[in-house]
Amino acid sequence: MDQIKNKLGEVFHRTMAHWNFDYNKLDETKVGVACIPWNDIDRAFLEGGIFEAIGFSYSMAKEDFAIRTAHQGCEQMARHYEVSDCTCQVVLIDNEVRAEVPTDLITD
């Protein structure tokens, strides 16, 4: 599961780069949230895919506020682009991958 978790962190960084942002350059306290399509997660997605909706926050006073702000951004982007079949979840807090991978996830 840790390998999948770390790959989700890479997908988040790749998605940020797609939108011309560098998560590593954002000031802490920072959070990255992504709308994760658990039913579509496979090796190809983990190696080259991007999330269709994300949210992020940075330079926040408190972690819980950073999480809430990033989560709202993800949900707003998902609504705007009419993304469905995914769940907005925390992927990164500062530089630590915090994604919670379902125990029944099978990737091919």
Give residue spans per PLM region:
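Secreted/extracellular ectodomain signature
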Residues: M1-D108
